[in-house]
A protein has these predicted regions:
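Rossmann-like NAD(P)-binding element
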Residues: 95-97, 102-127, 133, 137-142, ...
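Helix N-cap at the beta1-alpha1 junction of Rossmann-like dinucleotide-binding domains, i.e.
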Residues: 82-83, 146
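Adenosine-phosphate binding glycine-rich loop
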Residues: 42, 129-140, 144-205
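Short beta->alpha hinge that forms the Motif I/post-I loop of the SAM-binding pocket
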Residues: 80-81, 101
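Glycine-rich adenosine-cofactor-binding loop
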Residues: 29-33, 37-68, 72, 76-80
Length: 205
C-alpha cells in the first residue's frame, strides 16, 4: 500500500509538471492582484521604491504581500482604521498612519496603491499635489477601487502611469478565455498519465 501511495504521488507530480510545462495554462493570470504585480514588474520598478498604500483591506493586503515576496521593502500604509493600518504595516515592516493624515504626508512616494470603499475619489488634485511635495518625475498609481479612488483628471495633469482596475479586470477576462482554450490540451495530458499509471499498476500486479 505504501508503494502504491508513493507511486500515486510521483505520477501526480509528473502530471502537474507536464500540464504546466506543455500548455499555457499558467501563463495567463486571472487574478487582478497578479496582473497588477506583472504590470508593475514590467515597469522595472526598483525594489527600494517608496510604496504608499491607501487602504488596508484584502485586495491591498494581498498585493502588498505579493510585492514583499518579490523583495520590495519600503512600505507606508494609510487606513481609516489605524489598527488595521498598523497590522498590515507590521507585517510589511513598514509605517502606519490614519487616512486623515494623508494630506500631511511629506516623505514622497514612487508607487501609490489605493483600494478603499470610498464612494468619492480620495486622491484629489490637492491631496496628490501635497503627496508629491514638489517631486518631479513619473509616478505609478495602481487604483484597484470600485468606484475609483483617484480623480482621473490627474492622469492628464501630472506625469502618471496609471494601472487601473478596469483594464486589469478586462485582461483577467481575456486570460480566462485563453485558459479555457488550454483545457483540452490539459485533459489529453492528464488522460495520458492516467493510462501510464494504469499500465504500471497492472505490471506490478
Amino acid at each position: 500500500t505504501g508503494d502504491l501511495i508513493r507511486l500515486v504521488i510521483k505520477q501526480t507530480i509528473e502530471t502537474a509538471k507536464d500540464v504546466y510545462t506543455r500548455t499555457g495554462i499558467a501563463k495567463n493570470p486571472v487574478s487582478v492582484v497578479s496582473l497588477a504585480y506583472r504590470e508593475l514588474r514590467d515597469l522595472n520598478i526598483k525594489n527600494d521604491a517608496r510604496i504608499l498604500i491607501v487602504g488596508a483591506g484584502e485586495t491591498n493586503t494581498n498585493l502588498a504581500k505579493y510585492l514583499q515576496k518579490h523583495k520590495f521593502a519600503n512600505f507606508v500604509v494609510f487606513n481609516r482604521t489605524e489598527s488595521k493600518a498598523q497590522k498590515l504595516a507590521a507585517e510589511l515592516k513598514g509605517t502606519a498612519f490614519q487616512l486623515n493624515e494623508l494630506a500631511n504626508y511629506k516623505e514622497g512616494f514612487d508607487v501609490l496603491i489605493t483600494c478603499t470603499s470610498s464612494e468619492t475619489p480620495i486622491i484629489t488634485k490637492d491631496i496628490y499635489t501635497s503627496l508629491l511635495n514638489g517631486e518631479k518625475g513619473k509616478k505609478v498609481i495602481i487604483d484597484l477601487a470600485v468606484p475609483n479612488d483617484i480623480d482621473r483628471n490627474l492622469v492628464h495633469e501630472f506625469d502618471i502611469k496609471l494601472i487601473a482596475v478596469e483594464s486589469l479586470k478586462e485582461q483577467a477576462q481575456q486570460n480566462m478565455v485563453k485558459r479555457g482554450h488550454e483545457l483540452e490540451a490539459c485533459q489529453e495530458i492528464i488522460e495520458m498519465h492516467i493510462g501510464e499509471f494504469k499500465s504500471i499498476v497492472k505490471e506490478r500486479n
